[in-house]
Amino acid sequence: MKKPLILFLITAGLVLLLDQFTKFYVASHFWLHESLPVIDGFFNITYIRNPGAAFGFLAGAPLLFRGLFFTSVTLIAAGLILFYLIKNRVSDLMMVIPLALVLAGAMGNLVDRIRFGEVIDFLDVYIGRYHWPAFNIADTAISIGVLFLVVDMIQKQKEKS
């Protein structure tokens, strides 16, 4: 169990550092709402502050409620991830890495909420006429982690059949 736990902690730590570094860089080098085209018509770096969650969920709720809600949900999720990892002595890389990604992403956004009362987003994608809401490294880590967990569950379900 030691090696998977060390890998989990290193992965989560590196992703959290990358998330916080990129947010710090964008916040210190861009004006709020400033946008830099990277791939014209497809991908921009745009400095946004999001008081809500994905797609602006709870953005209009009072600051105290948002803070308590998002902090509680994040800490409960983090506790459940760590409990699951340790109790089940998870050693499968298809579980260790995705769980580390989800934890790091959740913690990265929690750090922003505690520091600023909102999350720094800056990855801005357009697909044709569709504009995806801006997101960050933490959101990406959570999405990739969940995707890998779902793929792993589907594969394990197929093996049982």
UniProtKB/Swiss-Prot annotation:
Superkingdom as given in the UniProt entry: Bacteria
This protein's record includes keyword Transport: no
Transmembrane region(s): 6-26, 67-87, 90-110, 134-154
Gene Ontology MF term list: aspartic-type endopeptidase activity
Bilayer topology: Multi-pass membrane protein
Enzyme Commission numbers on file: 3.4.23.36
GO biological process: proteolysis
Keyword annotations from UniProtKB, A to Z: Aspartyl protease, Cell inner membrane, Cell membrane, Hydrolase, Membrane, Protease, Transmembrane, Transmembrane helix
Location, primary (coarse class): membrane
Function comment: This protein specifically catalyzes the removal of signal peptides from prolipoproteins.
Family: Belongs to the peptidase A8 family.
Name of the protein described by the UniProt record: Lipoprotein signal peptidase
